[in-house]
Amino acid sequence: MEESNEPEALWIPNNNYFPNRNGYKPRYIIIHGTAGFTSAVEVANFFKSTEKGDNPVSTHYIIDLDGKLVQCNSESDGAYANGGVSEGHDAWWSKSLNPNLVTLSIEHVKLSRDNSDDIPDMQKEASFLLVKHLCERHNIPRRWANAEGGITGHYSMDPIHRSFCPGPYPWEELFAYLNTEK
């Protein structure tokens, strides 16, 4: 049994992933909102319940409203987190490469079904620290994503079905934090 890559994270694994990323390395961090759910454990258990279904889903990390972390898949594997790339996506996404093979995904518990709520301070602090650690561990650029990698929201690859994912997120604060915390 594996353990969490992030020391503070509760490990609630599932089998919804691509083992060893089919040889690819993570180049992007994708920020998501849960669009409902009340806790990270509830989200992790939902993902686990989809293991043998028609639409298995997962993520690497889930950040609760109070900043507690849950990890569902190893960073060395590609989580079933992003679906496909839709029309209108940012130019660097390849329609021929599954984005899950090159991304690390972080879900943020959001109570609203439309992801319209802001993230509270404890969740924001945990998110910023986790993004920093992921950038350090995987040499991901600490900036907005482009063809070489970086950080963006789910909307970047699927503006049709995920146009409001993650919803409000303190992007400018994140990049300021990442570029002062080296």
Q: Where do the language-model regions lie?
A:
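Basic/polar, cationic surfaces and motifs that engage anionic cell-wall
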Residues: 1-8, 23, 101, 109-182
